[in-house]
Amino acid sequence: MEEEEHEVYGGEIPEVGDTDVPDPDIDMSAADEDAVTELAEMKRRLKEMEEEAAALREMQAKVEKEMGATQDPASMAANQEGKEEVDARSVYVGNVDYACTPEEVQLHFQTCGTVNRVTILMDKFGQPKGFAYVEFVEVEAVQEALQLNESELHGRQLKVSPKRTNVPGMKQYHPGRFNPSMGYRFRRPFVPPYFYSPYGYGKAPRFRRPMRYMPYQ
């Protein structure tokens, strides 16, 4: 019986000095320094992100506070009172010439009192609407300005009246008043329009019954 040969190792047997063994004399401080530097950079970026988030929260809180202040009923009431006080010292001027300037309107009303502001309303295209508001410093100047109603400026008669304060959320409604000199106008009842009928006036159309099919017998 023949003996079988088994190959245990096909290469050369390495010597003891050829194996890779970590050298204990190698300095690992360089790798540690890189890790420490990277960790410090990550901490710095994280701190910057936290600071940005805090700034955004502070800005949002400030905006919400300002929005809440605008919706405060007390502040709205104060603003409304201030507007009413300004309107009490102002007049509405209608039928103003389109070529008229605020300076000319001021000169026209300066004999009534101290003019604080002249506002000529414009449309969305920047063209004058034909009326203006004149605000005085003194409340008594309003009565003097009303005396200039139907006075002429640029050849046109001005319509001067006290300025009315618009209440937010309310629409002004001016119902017609009964005038004894003009009489009361009744509304006429609705009368349907006359409808032309080809069958003649007052005659209803006559419809024939549909013919039934009768088969031959």
Curated annotation (Swiss-Prot):
Residues 30-71 form a coiled coil. Keywords: Coiled coil, Cytoplasm, Nucleus, RNA-binding. One of its GO terms (cellular component) is nuclear speck. InterPro entries: Nucleotide-bd_a/b_plait_sf (IPR012677), RBD_domain_sf (IPR035979), RRM_dom (IPR000504). Its main location: nucleus. GO terms for molecular function: poly(A) binding. Residues 15-28 have a biased composition (Acidic residues). A motif (Nuclear localization signal) lies at residues 162-169. Residues 75-216 are annotated as: Necessary for homooligomerization. SMART domains: RRM. Residues 89-165 form the RRM domain. Monomer and homooligomer. Binds RNA as a monomer and oligomerizes when bound to poly(A). Forms a complex with cleavage and polyadenylation specificity factor (CPSF) subunits PAPS4, PABN1, PABN2, CSTF50 and FIPS5. Interacts with CSP3. The RRM domain is essential for the recognition of specific adenine bases in the poly(A) tail, but not sufficient for poly(A) binding. Involved in the 3'-end formation of mRNA precursors (pre-mRNA) by the addition of a poly(A) tail of 200-250 nt to the upstream cleavage product. Stimulates poly(A) polymerase (PAPOLA) conferring processivity on the poly(A) tail elongation reaction and also controls the poly(A) tail length. Increases the affinity of poly(A) polymerase for RNA. Binds to poly(A) and to poly(G) with high affinity. May protect the poly(A) tail from degradation. This is Polyadenylate-binding protein 3. It comes from Arabidopsis thaliana. The gene is PABN3.
